[in-house]
Regions:
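Glycan-recognition and catalytic cores of secretory/periplasmic carbohydrate-active enzymes
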Residues: 1-189
């Protein structure tokens, strides 16, 4: 399925806006391009590209994800990448950008991804830490917190932060695969 899908994804959804690589959205019924938005949930894709071996695209898209993060010191739920305006200003403490940072570090050994992860973590703590845990943000521009912390923060976001800074042999990705909830599962051979 991946082999059949990735070429059309790269052909029809990849969008070079300025110097950045982004992936837009399409109507699943017609295939027509619909939006020039990219967001927190899309930030898993650099990691998936890295897992598939396409490190050049993975690096470029991760650079775009990090640019999205740095616009306001934390990523919005959705950004219009053509205008660089926030389309949905919430931040739900999502793991996807950290996940991609981990995979890129794992596959390249490039210290820039640990530095990127350090910035992500420091901003995460600075804007989301509370006396009782971590709080989602209602607005990444104002940094207004909301009384919400989804379970994936502990199950995924912190796990990927840990893995990014742990010894590289903490998980052997030749023997382990992380599922969509970041649970390690033994790979069949």
């Amino acid at each position: 399925m991946w082999e059949a899908s990735i070429a059309p994804i790269n052909k029809y959804l990849a969008d070079n806006a300025g110097t950045q690589l982004w992936y837009g959205h399409a109507d699943m019924q017609t295939g027509s391009r619909t939006l020039t938005t990219y967001g927190a949930l899309d930030a898993f894709f650099p990691g998936l590209l890295a897992l598939s071996g396409d490190l050049e695209r993975a690096r470029r898209l991760q650079s775009s994800s990090f640019k999205m993060w740095n616009l306001h010191g934390i990523e919005p739920e959705t950004l219009d990448y053509h205008t660089l305006r926030v389309a949905n200003s919430a931040y739900h403490l999502r793991p996807e950008i950290v996940e991609s940072t981990y995979y890129l570090y794992h596959f390249t050994g490039d210290q820039r991804y640990r530095r990127m992860g350090e910035k992500l973590f420091n901003d995460f703590v600075r804007y989301c830490r509370t006396d009782a845990g971590y709080a989602a943000l209602a607005d990444v521009v104002t940094k207004q917190q909301r009384d919400e912390m989804e379970s994936f923060v502990l199950a995924e976001t912190f796990k990927y932060f840990y893995l990014l800074f742990a010894s590289p042999n903490t998980l052997d990705l030749e023997k382990i695969v992380l599922n969509t909830e970041a649970h390690p599962l033994m790979r069949e051979r």
